[in-house]
């Protein structure tokens, strides 16, 4: 005899992508609760138009974050966590980038934001629109790390693009340029 919980309790390994020519990509978008239906309507247009291979969606409630600079919840939000499959090719990556940017624009148009980041697909303009305290965050980062010891691709794309990141002619070295 089996209980319903036993029958419905499959391990996550059954969802694991075992195809060498594709990969699964998580996206997460945060939208004010009152606009979730409009956001879903926009996604119903965008995803098929961009031929997105959506595998799964999880919805969760997010409380307001008043503590962090890069907050994704400026008020109560609903988050859509979406799992997409994409080809591991330059074309697959370009398609996912285009899809992502359109979904970010849809979230932004409703006062929402995107999660930071699973992929660096957001333009610097989209990033700064979604995270208005980013400039202050990057200023603090440079204040506490003036030599640029701690860097990653996120910082190189969005922090160096930030106004004032080239202060006094100082450009932080990319990791490959630094001697150890």
Where are these regions (language model features)?
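Activity-critical C-terminal alpha-helical subdomain
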Residues: 13-14, 108-180
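Substrate-recognition/cap regions that form aromatic- and gly/pro-loop-enriched pockets
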Residues: 2-130
């Amino acid at each position: 005899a089996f209980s319903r919980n036993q029958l419905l309790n499959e391990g996550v390994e059954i969802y694991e992508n075992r195809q060498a020519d594709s990969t699964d990509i998580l996206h997460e978008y945060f939208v004010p609760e009152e606009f979730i239906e409009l956001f879903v309507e926009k996604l119903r247009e965008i995803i098929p138009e961009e031929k997105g291979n959506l595998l799964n969606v999880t919805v969760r409630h997010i409380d307001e974050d008043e503590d962090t600079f890069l907050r994704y919840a400026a008020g109560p939000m609903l988050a859509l966590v979406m799992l997409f499959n994409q080809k591991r090719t330059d074309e697959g990556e370009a398609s996912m980038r285009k899809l992502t940017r359109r979904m970010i624009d849809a979230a932004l148009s409703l006062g929402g934001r995107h999660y930071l980041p699973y992929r660096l697909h957001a333009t610097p303009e989209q990033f700064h629109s979604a995270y208005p305290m980013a400039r202050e965050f990057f200023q603090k980062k440079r204040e506490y790390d003036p030599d640029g010891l701690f860097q990653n691709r996120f910082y190189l794309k969005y922090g160096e693009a930030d106004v004032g990141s080239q202060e006094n002619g100082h450009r932080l070295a990319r990791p490959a340029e630094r001697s150890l």
